[in-house]
Amino acid sequence: MTKTLEDRIIKLEETVYFQEKTISELNDALTQQQLQLDEMHKLQQAVEIKLRQMAPLLRDADAGDDGPPPHYL
């Protein structure tokens, strides 16, 4: 094998190594983001449930305020 061919092969091997390393790091980051997204989705669902539970209470509280505000009296 000639020196230039050997150098080219070494360069290609280095490139493949760094690409594989980058792909692995990106995969780790994507996995972490998906876990965070799943957690945020669970929290959003919990907030929606709480809001649905509170909606009747808020409507009932608003129903009693039919009179004029105190500063109009």
Curated annotation (Swiss-Prot):
InterPro entries: SlyX. Gene3D superfamilies: 1.20.5.300. It holds the Pfam family SlyX. The lineage of its organism: Bacteria, Pseudomonadati, Thermodesulfobacteriota, Desulfovibrionia, Desulfovibrionales. It comes from Oleidesulfovibrio alaskensis (strain ATCC BAA-1058 / DSM 17464 / G20) (Desulfovibrio alaskensis). Belongs to the SlyX family. HAMAP family: SlyX. This is Protein SlyX homolog.
